[in-house]
């Protein structure tokens, strides 16, 4: 659009935050939020501001950043992205602290007592920030689990000061925020709500601004009452479990959640009061879709995709084995990415087998558990899912032993359950098995519902297939729509073919447990990555990055 410049784009950015019907910076007319003109102006302004930042111009048009300073403002105020920590060489931080320390699972509203002085190199990062401008702290070349936990520790200390006053009245991303020290920018919207990029000045004495993501989700009046009684949304409870995986060195491929607050009025246009929750999380600067633009050498493309696929299946394995969680919405938009140096390797241990995973510069992050379900009895839900077969113990066991039940619980309105005789298949070789709290289905063998490896829920299959089809293309399993897929090397398409070509039906193959269990699938696909040496973890190897035990003993999770 002709007439747009840095000044008008800055005014447009302010207008969007103040009103859901902002005025056009060109015509002065009110524009519908997320309408075609609104989107066009937003997109063009993003380009203008990005080009201005690249030129070193002041995209904040004035001294907006100076308001965070204590005392007189500096001689000049620069753009947010103009001065980043000047890391000339990637630094890999040894993560022995994260896997050998006595770390406790995440308590509600708090991150951990992981002290920042334990993280080598953080003081050096602070000193390299520009002395007269707020800089954004990026993970790209300093990405490691201890570094993420250190940032979380600082957020915890920050929120301890405000949670008593603002726990149920913190409207950061609303049109009329209740706190003045956050600066927000909307980066995504959907039927679930809004995701915003938020800058907090908690490091202002070091002249560093740390970004984070805030997910605003609408909640009903009944959910609000439950929150007041500390019965939080299910998604946040899942996030709490996910945090424990990061704190205990189980798997790094998840988003770290900092805190949850509630806003009593999320909109200023509706006459009806709209309540929402605001979840503070790590911020990542792109989804898996961004790797389509990556230029990878032809001889490295196969290893590049295999590294990403392994890490995603490792995240699925962590939620399956440890909590019985089915994500139900795996797609490229829900796989965020963190960029690394592209050097070295990680070690993932799954059922006693250590896999050396090459670092190809991308760490996929599984996010958004809004429609996820847990079938574990320890998670508090009453539905334990369909359990059609037993998988014998052993990391290389792909056999599936079907069993039968006599009764089938059926859930009706208001979650009222009635018990009916179980149904047989036409050949009368197996029954439809479902387990529910308080109902004895009379199985033909003893069934341990908490053991997700021996008695996996049937819906585990959905996440396994969705990950493969996300790369090859195809229909989604539980949600409407299609996976667009990637331009893959033929070897990767053939690599994923055994998963993609198997239809989802009611009868399970007898020797393909890897279609349900990510732990078995990783052994089936990546057996050549297993480290068969009996040596200890190579902490002194300069190429070694971090170690994760994806399937730890149950005692480690409950300690």
Curated annotation (Swiss-Prot):
Coiled coil: none annotated. GO terms for molecular function: ATP binding; protein serine kinase activity; protein serine/threonine kinase activity. InterPro entries: 2-cysteine_adaptor (IPR014901), Kinase-like_dom_sf (IPR011009), Prot_kinase_dom (IPR000719), Protein_kinase_ATP_BS (IPR017441), Ser/Thr_kinase_AS (IPR008271). It catalyses: L-seryl-[protein] + ATP = O-phospho-L-seryl-[protein] + ADP + H(+); L-threonyl-[protein] + ATP = O-phospho-L-threonyl-[protein] + ADP + H(+). Its EC number is 2.7.11.1. SMART domains: S_TKc. The active site is at residue 329. It holds the Pfam family 2C_adapt. It comes from the Viruses. Residues 181-526 form the Protein kinase domain. ATP binds at residues 187-195, 215. Keywords: ATP-binding, Kinase, Nucleotide-binding, Serine/threonine-protein kinase, Transferase. Belongs to the protein kinase superfamily. Ser/Thr protein kinase family. This is Probable serine/threonine-protein kinase 010L. It comes from Invertebrate iridescent virus 3 (IIV-3).
